[in-house]
């Protein structure tokens, strides 16, 4: 399965803290998990066409991430929004997806991502 993990490029500390744990997770070995920061000159719009799922780290407001979420919606991808406890997320997201997860620890986030992927397998 191909999974795109979208996140803010600026002030991306919530996902940066979890990044290495997700990369070391068994899920990353079983599926193609892509973070935009791993790629140079990356065309996320084109890449999303070939994805099975989008996980959006929405703790930090980001116009670019909002655009990517819009593309994922246009392509009919399931979208799962995750955010750090205490973050104020955009109300507009509820019109895009009903899948939200608030996490306190990196371990909670990785466990949630593993659960989502295991339950959505193609």
Task: Specify the residue positions occupied by each region the protein language model found.
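Conserved catalytic or regulatory cores that recognize and/or transform ribose-phosphate-containing ligands
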Residues: 1-122
């Amino acid at each position: 399965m191909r999974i795109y993990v979208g996140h803010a490029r600026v002030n991306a500390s919530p996902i940066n803290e979890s990044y290495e744990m997700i990369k070391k997770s068994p899920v990353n070995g079983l599926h193609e998990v892509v973070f935009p920061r791993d790629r140079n000159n990356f065309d996320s719009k084109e890449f999303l066409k070939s994805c099975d799922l989008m996980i959006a780290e929405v703790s930090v407001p980001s116009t670019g991430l909002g655009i990517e979420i819009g593309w994922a919606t246009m392509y009919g991808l399931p979208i799962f929004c995750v955010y750090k406890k205490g973050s104020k997320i955009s109300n507009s997201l509820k019109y895009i997806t009903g899948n939200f997860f608030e996490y306190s620890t990196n371990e909670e986030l990785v466990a949630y991502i593993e659960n989502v992927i295991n339950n959505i397998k193609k």
